[in-house]
Amino acid sequence: MASRGVNKVILVGNLGQDPEVRYMPNGNAVANITVATSESWKDQQGQQQERTEWHRVVLFGKLAEITGEYLRKGSQVYLEGKLQTRKWKDQSGQDRYSTEVVIDQSGSMQMLGSRNQGGQGAPMGGMPQNGGYQSAPQQAAPAQNQYAPAPQAAPAYQAPAPQPQSGYNQPPAQQSYGQQQAQPHVQPHAQPQQGGYAPKPAAPAYQAPAAPAQRPAPQPQQNFTPDLDDGWDDDIPF
């Protein structure tokens, strides 16, 4: 392909006059238009300069029909085709050569901008290849619709987010409940130890009655001895 070269032309400009459309014997349409492209620059003196180039463009087939129906003088268009030079004869019979931009089925044409009659030109964009131009906003519209459900999925994500938090709150509640159960076990165990320690001080009270310190028994003996002195000596046979 590189050895054969590339023949491709892209133009963005405005029509200099209304399209001329004619039909060939086989019924195919042919449209001739002239497109102006302008460029501006500043010269060495700083003055603004502008230059306009005129391009002859020939369209074939369906594109030619759409061009004649929707394009008018002043319409801004995007054209993509190839350069082609043809030979023809003038009225005097002399050969003439013309280099034109040919746009056939392999090329493309799109309308840019609009005029007062742009309402007619707008549908043109959607008829042939420009249908891709109108389909672009249609693709943008579903893109917005796809973005609208995205916020709706956030809340759904947010919705499950509190659920794991609530589940996390439940395990600590069980831990606190386990701690509360552990506390009652510790407290009753501490109480029996204190209860066991309480009877130990009661042991001295038990020693008080057990102690035979109360020996009143010798007292009757003392009372008994005076009785012996009083009368028991006489009764003793010895």
Swiss-Prot record:
UniProt subunit comment: Homotetramer.
Record Pfam families: SSB
Positions with biased composition (Low complexity): 125-160, 170-222
DNA-binding region per Swiss-Prot/TrEMBL record: 54-60
Biased composition (Acidic residues): 227-238
Biased composition (Polar residues): 105-115
Cited InterPro entries: NA-bd_OB-fold, Primosome_PriB/ssb, ssDNA-bd
Locus of motif Important for interaction with partner proteins: 233-238
GO cellular component: nucleoid
Gene3D superfamilies xref list: Nucleic acid-binding proteins
Name the UniProt record assigns to this protein: Single-stranded DNA-binding protein
Taxonomic superkingdom: Bacteria
GO molecular function, one term: enzyme activator activity
UniProt-annotated stretches for the region Disordered: 103-238
HAMAP family: SSB (MF_00984)
Domain SSB: 6-110
GO biological process: DNA recombination; DNA repair; DNA replication
Protein task: Plays an important role in DNA replication, recombination and repair. Binds to ssDNA and to an array of partner proteins to recruit them to their sites of action during DNA metabolism.
Presence of the UniProt keyword DNA repair in the record: yes
Keywords: DNA damage, DNA recombination, DNA repair, DNA replication, DNA-binding
PROSITE patterns: SSB
Gene transcribed to yield this protein: ssb
Species in which this protein is naturally found: Shewanella oneidensis (strain ATCC 700550 / JCM 31522 / CIP 106686 / LMG 19005 / NCIMB 14063 / MR-1)
